[in-house]
Amino acid sequence: ELMKITLVMFLAAYYDWLPAKRVSRPFWVLLPIVIICIPTALVLQQPDLGTSILLLAAGGGLMFLAGVHWAYFAAVIGSGVAVITAVFQSRGESWQLLNDYQYRRIDTFLDPAADPLGAGYHITQSKIALGSGGWTGRGFMQGTQSRLNFLPEKHTDFIFTTLAEEFGFVGAISLLGLYALIIVFCVVTAIRNKDRFSSLLTLGIALNFFLFFAVNMAMVMGLAPVVGVPLPLVSYGGSAMVVLLQAFGLVQSAHVHRPR
């Protein structure tokens, strides 16, 4: 959890120090890539594929916002396609790149109905709960899927499903609206801030925040594989909450102490 904010702080400080004319030169692009890959590799060893991918995305996104030329990202995307191809080709081989449970998650994402009582149980129950909420929901503490324990992990990764079942489409959109207000505040703070470090730091925190809630919501709706990413400010978990509040404290500091 600490690495999410530490990585953003390092990249913001790096690009604040680096002259703008050097931002896209190969040598100066390589260093932040190495710094991003080190914690990503450590998280991947846990193994936590979802968080490691989001660290890469957040780091790469901040590099783009700092002004790194788009050609580097085109090369990364091309390499990513090659890696994904290798991942699928390695399945069942002695050198397979993912664990068996990670391949099962991909299979479940592509066809959850193939094993509705096994690997596809989580996402199947999640979709049932989302659909049963309707426009206004079943009412607080009245959700059948979540309260009768049909829905696993309802207090952590799948808490958005519980909210949508009990408060319906209106409740889900209201939460999205609150998230959007936070993102807008961060972006406006970054735009108005003349200090490059504070601006990049605020944008990096906003990007991290967006990626985690977007992936969580996509995951519980079946639009992305189940990767164990919590819903910011809502899911159960002390360390994630503390780190996120620290990040928002930095945003507030950037807003209050911005050069006039």
Regions found by a protein language model. Name each.
Residues 1-119, 161-222, 246, 250:
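Hydrophobic alpha-helical transmembrane segments of multi-pass inner membrane proteins, especially
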Residues 1-3, 45-47, 51, 134, ...:
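Glycine/serine-rich anion-binding loops at beta->alpha junctions
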Residues 104-107, 121-128, 154-158:
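Short hydrophobic, aromatic-rich alpha-helical segments embedded in or entering the lipid bilayer
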Residues 113-141:
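Extracytosolic (periplasmic/ER-lumenal) interhelical loops and adjacent juxtamembrane/interface segments
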Residues 130, 134-170, 197:
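Long extracytoplasmic/lumenal interhelical loops at the membrane interface
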Residues 215-260:
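A juxtamembrane structural motif centered on a specific transmembrane helix
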